[in-house]
From Swiss-Prot:
It is found in: Plastid, Chloroplast. This is Maturase K. GO terms for biological process: mRNA processing; RNA splicing; tRNA processing. One of its GO terms (molecular function) is RNA binding. Belongs to the intron maturase 2 family. MatK subfamily. It comes from Bowiea volubilis. The gene is matK. Keywords: Chloroplast, mRNA processing, Plastid, RNA-binding, tRNA processing. Pfam families: Intron_maturas2 (PF01348), MatK_N (PF01824). Transmembrane segments: none annotated. One of its GO terms (cellular component) is chloroplast.
Amino acid sequence: MKEFQGYLEKDRSRQQHLLYPLLFQEYIYALAHDHGLNGSIFSEPVEVFGYDNKSSLALVKRLITRIYQQNYLIISVNDSNQNGFVGDNRFFYSHFYSQMISESFAIIVEIPFSPRLVSDFKEKEIPKYHNLRSIHSIFPFLEDKLSHLNYVSDILIPHPIHMEISVQILQCWIQDIPFLHSLRFFLHEYHNSNSLLVTQKKSIHVFLKENKRLFQFLYNSYVFECEFLLVFTRKQSSYLRLTSFGTFLERTLFYGKIEYFICRNYFHRTLWFFKEPFMHYVRYQGKAILASKGTHLMMKKWKYHFVNFWQYYFHFWTQPYRXHINQLSNSFFYFLGYLSXLLRNSSAVRNQMLENSFLIDTVTKKFDTIVPVIFLIGSLSKAKFCTVSGHPISKPIWADLSDSDILDRFGRICRNLSHYHSGSSKKQGLYQIKYILQLSCARTLARKHKSTVRTFLRRLGSELLEEFFMEEEQVLSLIFPQTTPFTLHGSHRERIWYLDIICINDLVNHS
């Protein structure tokens, strides 16, 4: 740990050039083992094979020796392909090494982007309270901002990303060529391995539950690059007109191209480039929304800007259907588990002035959120709580549990959904979801006791289930440490929100 801290205290520019030697340091793999492998599936096989901490250190030394020999990846892949059962030591070695290398790459690649990591090792007093910024803080923000806007674009960020593109993104910040070559070789050799979440097309897919730290970092760097270039092109070229935005896509020569085109085109031409001061961008998971006060033509230009941007810069063949343009006053858009829209309420006020009277029509806008019943029923059907049409069914996999455990599981899901969607203006959809869960719980208990639902409820009493589902659980207040995100291209002065609490229940995340 002291060696690792001393390395971090060096100049940041030197860190970017000296990442490759860290692959041969034992303390890096010790950190990787403590961070990623203690709570993973590899902690159990170590005990099965009779390895302790000293034996794990011997495995690390053997891994470093293989790295020196430059054939550790090929050997690991061959071992994992030939031995497909956990009882084989070679199978365990190959997967242990692959997981260890993946975690080590993740730790090393995060070093240039963690300038404040050194201060985290120092003992300091932790403040008792922080201002939490949860997903629910988005809705007051949207209610305040969207009431003045006209259109919103629902954008699906393209995925999966190609491994070569992710390595090229890292080349903008990391100048250690041997380290990048090792990372590229590691990703390409393991694109078909089951131990790493990489698809057969050599693309990183991060929307799976069991995710690795390295691939999460690569995806986050890709999203950060998209957002940075979006802000960069909008700020630096907002005064350019009748100039193709594809010309200014390469940011390394951006200022030179601006100077060249301005000098060549100094005539009085109407120059513009998506200039829109009233614009808001919000991203969550793999989706984003772009709201604007501009016209429908302006939103279509932004739509095709994104399509060409992903095509020419990230080599994505993106279809236009990934970005939907909706008018806020006429349609709903799905965001963070809610169907949101902008309602217009008109009212007439009679004004009397002396002998004359006249009517004043006032229009007020209200940001409305309703429960997406269809999406929630689809999620419940995938979890085997009901059919696709919303008919409650029993949960056979829970029939072996005790009655209290069954009630507790159903009640926890119901209360979580109730807490999350309690801010909706219309509660009928929420009551329908609660009824489906309540009847599914009753069918599961009746299946366990080999009885009908009516007989079971008559014997147990319907009031018990009713009181159980109506009982409010005390909400736990979570305190998260305040973290400052790394600034890859310098600090942004835009008001960008980084949320601490991002999810409350898996059923909120719809595909």
